[in-house]
Structure formats: structure tokens, C-alpha cells
């Protein structure tokens, strides 16, 4: 279990990384933690200067990580940018930094805490910055799933593979049961490794990345995959369906990438003749199949860097990154548009804004530790084991 700690507040940890407003939640609070009363106003004209001053005062004691999906107002203060795993490794490579300020979401901060030393303190500027996909698989649900696999007589044949976008509890379960973690960049290698260890894979929490990797990269058929729904008895599957399947996909998805549809692809091709469609593998299978290129955020960035002048691109990933890339490459005569007509931000990622970052940096500069993300030792040990298996992948 993970605790989020604020020295000045006596709060109880919540079981999920994100307590959605509307589910018996107080709109004046964030995941059971009172909103800081001295949070700066978004209209404060001195926010940039305040953030810069606090960061300079902290010096080498602080290391700010910025995920690709963050707002520009936050990214400008990041010491490094990248995807979740790259940032966690970047944090581990800076042992002199006492504070790791992770401008991302909860599971990312957990991963950074797992990979950094016990002396380092990982901080999340807004505790409500969770991940709906990571929250789609709880430890209790996954344990129940394993019981279902055991009753079907196949648990010993199953190797769990968990996406980096999962909670520390799920990573720990994966490590404890002989599995590995994967990213969107190395999912193919992770699955190949898993099938060398066992006959079947339980892939969680993102069904789309699992399906796309199995079918597109490993040459499986859609019939080789079944979807386990944690909200239905026995996952909505019969014992025979489980025994016949090679890939058991958890019924989870990214709310951002799940919005893209085949209509989105067809529409942009009609509007922009000659456009290259480049999407993230968290998109639905039919979208990935219709795209010209598929890859992680790092792949998307590198593909656009290498693209020739005059080329046209429709990108299926989070809007903050797409806008940033469009602005960056406009001078090189590369036309870059968002794949869908509908604006599609990651709402929880966008909870990290400049006021929260300023409040965090100023609090740390004043000697007050806020919003610490800390994974307990047992969970950390098994989660780290799963991460180390990933690092050792051929």
C-alpha cells in the first residue's frame, strides 16, 4: 500500500490513487487531503518568478521531472522530460537530490520512489493527479482474478505482465508471481520473455496495449485473446475460455487514447490528403490497424524529428504533447495536427498546474515536506523485482 504524506496535516491514506469527485467525495478536498489553503491564485502574475526563485533557493536539493503530457507552464521548470519509466530512472540517477518533484501522476511518483534511495523524498504537487487506467486494476481484484485462474487449473501456466501504468500494488503482485513490467516501447520483448516462462500471459491493466502487441508484433490472432472483466463473476469468462486463451487481457484502458476511433482516422485522411497517421499503442486495435505508424511517446517524438520538411502528420496521443510538437516543428514546415476533432487532454495529468508547482517548491524551500509519495518496504521489494526483470530483458 502507498501512503501520501503531508507533514502539517493529519490525514488517512485512501485506497486508490484517485478518488473521483462524485463518488461520495467532498469537492473541496483532494483524495481525502484538504486543498492547501495557501495555494497561489492562477491569476497571480508572479507565479513564474516565484517558481523560479523557490527552485533556485533549493538548488541541487530538488530535481523536477516533467512528463510529456504536462502543460507548458509546468514543463518549463522541468530539469528533464520524458515518459514515466525514463523519468523514474532519471530520478534514480540523481542521488544527490533530496527532493524529487514528479510532475506527472500518482503511479509515476510511486515508481520513482521504488527506484530511488530511501534518503530521497518523492513529491507529487497535486495528490488528486491519479490515473484512471491504473485505478482500473486494484490489488483485491487482481488477487480474485488469480483465484479464478487457479480454479480453472491454469494459474501455474500464467505469467503476469503489467504495464508501467499500474499501481505499486499491481507491480508488486506481478513481481511476486514471477512476472515483469513493460513499457509501450518494450512490450514486445516483455511478452516474448513471458511466453518463454509460461504458456499464457495475464496482461494488465491496459487491454489495448496487450492486444495490439500480441496481434501486431507477436502474430497472434484476436481469437487468442480474451478479456477479463473484474466487475463480472469469474471475469465474465468460462474455465474453457480461459484454458483456450493465450492472452488474458485485463479490461482496462486509457481514457485519452480510448477516445480515438476509426472514424477519426478516416476523417483526417479525407481532410488532409497525404497525411501520415501516427498513434500510441494504447489506442484501440482498429485504430492501430488503420494507422501508418504506431509507437510510444518517445517513438512519436523521434519520428517527427526525422520526418522530412513538408510532411503532414496526424497524431493520436495526449493533446499537450501534440501541441508542443506542432509548435516545435512548425519552423521546419512540418504540419502536425491532433488526430481527433474533439479536444482530448488527460484531465488528471492536467491537475498539475503552475499554482500547485509553486506551492510545492515554496513549501520545500521553507523546509516543509508536502505530498510525499512513499511505498511500503514489502510492496517496494516485490515491485522492484518486477522492474528489475524488465531491465534485464534481452
Curated annotation (Swiss-Prot):
Binds 1 [4Fe-4S] cluster per subunit. Keywords: 4Fe-4S, Cytoplasm, Iron, Iron-sulfur, Metal-binding, Pyridine nucleotide biosynthesis, Transferase. Pfam families: NadA. Its EC number is 2.5.1.72. Catalyzes the condensation of iminoaspartate with dihydroxyacetone phosphate to form quinolinate. Belongs to the quinolinate synthase family. Type 3 subfamily. This is Quinolinate synthase. It comes from Streptomyces coelicolor (strain ATCC BAA-471 / A3(2) / M145). The gene is nadA.
Amino acid at each position: 500500500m502507498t501512503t501520501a504524506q503531508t507533514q502539517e496535516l493529519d490525514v488517512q491514506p485512501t485506497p486508490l490513487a484517485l478518488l473521483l469527485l462524485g463518488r461520495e467525495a467532498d469537492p473541496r478536498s483532494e483524495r481525502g487531503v484538504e486543498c492547501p489553503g495557501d495555494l497561489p491564485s492562477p491569476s497571480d502574475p508572479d507565479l513564474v518568478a516565484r517558481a523560479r526563485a523557490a527552485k533556485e533557493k533549493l538548488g541541487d536539493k530538488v530535481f523536477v521531472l516533467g512528463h510529456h503530457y504536462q502543460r507548458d507552464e509546468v514543463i518549463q521548470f522541468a530539469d528533464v522530460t520524458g515518459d514515466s519509466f525514463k523519468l523514474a530512472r532519471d530520478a534514480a540517477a540523481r542521488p544527490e537530490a533530496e527532493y524529487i518533484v514528479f510532475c506527472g501522476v500518482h503511479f509515476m511518483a510511486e515508481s520513482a520512489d521504488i527506484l530511488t534511495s530511501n534518503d530521497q523524498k518523492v513529491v507529487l504537487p497535486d495528490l488528486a493527479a491519479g490515473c484512471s487506467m491504473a485505478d482500473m486494476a486494484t490489488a483485491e481484484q487482481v488477487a480474485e482474478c488469480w483465484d479464478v485462474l487457479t480454479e480453472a487449473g491454469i494459474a501455474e501456466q500464467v505469467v503476469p505482465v503489467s504495464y508501467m501504468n499500474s499501481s505499486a500494488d499491481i507491480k508488486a503482485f506481478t513481481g511476486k508471481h514471477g512476472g515483469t513490467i513493460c513499457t509501450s516501447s518494450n512490450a514486445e520483448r516483455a511478452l516474448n520473455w513471458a511466453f518463454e516462462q509460461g504458456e499464457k500471459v495475464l496482461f494488465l491493466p491496459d487491454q489495448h496495449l496487450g492486444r495490439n502487441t500480441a496481434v501486431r508484433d507477436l502474430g497472434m490472432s484476436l481469437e487468442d485473446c480474451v478479456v477479463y472483466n473484474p466487475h463480472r463473476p469469474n471475469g465474465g469468462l468460462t474455465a474453457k475460455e480461459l484454458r483456450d486463451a493465450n492472452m488474458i487481457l485485463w479490461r482496462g484502458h486509457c481514457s485519452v487514447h480510448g477516445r480515438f476511433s476509426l472514424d477519426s482516422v478516416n476523417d483526417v485522411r479525407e481532410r488532409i490528403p497525404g497525411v501520415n497517421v501516427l498513434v500510441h499503442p494504447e489506442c484501440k486495435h482498429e485504430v492501430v490497424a488503420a494507422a501508418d505508424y504506431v509507437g510510444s511517446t518517445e517513438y512519436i517524438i523521434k519520428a517527427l524529428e526525422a520526418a522530412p520538411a513538408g510532411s503532414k502528420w496526424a497524431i493520436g496521443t495526449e493533446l499537450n504533447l501534440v501541441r508542443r510538437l506542432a509548435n516545435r516543428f512548425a519552423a521546419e514546415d512540418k504540419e502536425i495536427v491532433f488526430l481527433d476533432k474533439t479536444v482530448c487532454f488527460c484531465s488528471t495529468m492536467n491537475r498539475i498546474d503552475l499554482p500547485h508547482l509553486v506551492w510545492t517548491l515554496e513549501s520545500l524551500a521553507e523546509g516543509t515536506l508536502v505530498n510525499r509519495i512513499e511505498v511500503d518496504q514489502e510492496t517496494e521489494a516485490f515491485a522492484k523485482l518486477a522492474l528489475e526483470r524488465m531491465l534485464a530483458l534481452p
